[in-house]
Amino acid sequence: MVSPRESTPLERLPLSHAGLYSVQDGTLFCGHQSGFFSTCSVTLWHIAEVLERTGEMPRRIDFSRAFRWFRNAEQTRDASDMYPLFFRPGAVDATRGLTWLPRVRYHGLYRWIDYQRFGLVMERYFQPSEKARAFQSQWIARYGIDPAKTIAVVYRGTDKSTELALASPRAYVDQARKILERHPDFRILIQTDELAVRDLFVEEFGSRCFFIEDMPVSRHGVVVHELDDASLQRDRGEFGVMLVAVTELLSRAAFVVNHTGNLALWVCLWRGHSRGVVQFDSTGGLVDFGSVGFYLRQGRHLAERAWRRLVPQRASQP
């Protein structure tokens, strides 16, 4: 294996967001440090960048410089490559013939994802590892999970409000209730980083709602992966494995009430389509392509984004 330090300048291709590609052996090194699925989304950008600049797909992915918050002390000391702990590669032929990959938008509308292209990438690079599959098997047995009769609710709180507008937890409750009224034999799986939101769903739906008890939650608005080891109460590398396991499991549900963010994006990427997905967008509103109000809200949001980009440019002019 060639490490970033061993490659010569002519063999290294610097990428955006602390990425590096070894032209010699086709290894993609990701150095992005953020939330788990933020790092995964940036890796997708890297793959697209390598394909655009070299005409080839990376042969392998190396996460020895990434996932700072998702490695234990030994893995940190040894600069372990975390890829094989979290993921399992699929067939190399899966992406044969792929000549272009769009830049995935984690704050976008998930209905418009190019699922055909990204499905090939997911198949080749991002199959859940055997450890992740083992967690899934345990949870399916423990909770009697039947994905075909499950409504997954994915609510991301804590610091997410600093990035975008959030719909209220009650709005998620309302959407879950509407689906449950149409499918009274279904159950709700609530996955959230906020204890108060989890408690709300249990209070509203009682025995028809359940959650994965192994997944940590925050009680004070602290981002879960930034909790200290005593509060997290689990091995950090194992926590990363569980994030892969629970997110891919959520993707299999018959219905998903989803937020907008990196984890939400990866639910859809593993799902491979947006059918049965209810999304609250980056404005905090419900994505409804049949509503005039939705288009007005999106237009206003895009205009505000364009204005924010224009104002600094105008201010910098003499």
Question: What are the residue ranges of the model-derived segments?
Answer:
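Active-site donor-binding loop signature of nucleotide-sugar glycosyltransferases
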Residues: 155-157, 214, 282
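Nucleotide-sugar donor-binding patch of glycosyltransferase catalytic domains
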Residues: 262-318
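Donor-binding and catalytic core of enzymes assembling or modifying cell-surface/extracellular glycoconjugates
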Residues: 186-280
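Low-complexity, flexible helical/coil segments
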Residues: 62-65, 185-193, 224-227, 291-298
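Hydrophobic transmembrane alpha-helix bundles
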Residues: 95-106, 219-236, 298-307
